[in-house]
Amino acid sequence: DLGWSRGLGDVYKRQASMISNDIKRIKLAVKECAELPIGGTAVGTGINTLEGFDTLVCSFITEETDIDFSVCTNKFELLSSQNPLSNLSSQLKICAGSLNKIANDIRWLASGPMAGIGELKLPSNEPGSSIMPGKVNPTQCEAVNMVYAQILGNDLTINYAGTNGNFELNTYRPIIASSIHESITLLSEVSESFTLNALDGLKANKEKIKENLDKSLMLV
């Protein structure tokens, strides 16, 4: 009914660009989280800590994990605030939202077989409905939808927890760590599952695309 794209290639490039840019932002957020307030003791003063303890610990953790950890510039801030982790959670949420949009677009384009758009064909990973022949359930798309809902909730929890530390010390780190770990795990696993069980087997319904194109009002 409206202007069309030049083909599915344009659609796929747009989707790939969304995820690629989201990954870049996640990597920047992860880098910020590698700055540690280690050696600040309870509130950031570093009282009763040996000189050089912070850099020594960061060097050890870097060697053990192969991740470049460093001492933060203001230990008072990172002991009281969890903004870097809140930012990482938000970037994970944004990436999950992009994946959610892609899944919904694919689900609608694959709807059918008779009354839907039907321009894409999803792989039949499991039996469809016994009373609706030809129907393919978009289970992988729905899995992405549910993961996005969970990550939205985790992000709200993390941001709430990050603002509820009293004075110099934030005691909400356990729920922040638990929630962000769940978000990372879910996003990683659903991305792999969606790729293997939906995207890799996705096919264009060329006949239906031509039919819809031939009936488009844009041809007037």
List the predicted regions and their residue ranges.
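Glycine-rich phosphate/diphosphate-binding loop of Rossmann-like nucleotide-binding domains
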Residues: 24-37
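Acidic, glycine-rich loop-and-beta core segments that form the ion-binding/anion-interacting portion
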Residues: 43-125
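Glycine-rich tight-turn/loop motif centered on a GG-T
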Residues: 9, 46-47, 133
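Amphipathic alpha-helical coiled-coil segments
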Residues: 19, 26, 85-88, 92-95, ...
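Structural preference for solvent-exposed beta-strand-turn elements
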Residues: 10, 14-17, 24
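Short acidic-hydrophobic sequence patches enriched in Asp/Glu that either
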Residues: 18, 49-57, 136-143
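Catalytic-core signal marking the mid-to-C-terminal active-site face
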Residues: 22, 77, 81, 85, ...
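Single conserved hydrophobic/aromatic residue that forms the stacking wall/gate
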Residues: 1-8, 12
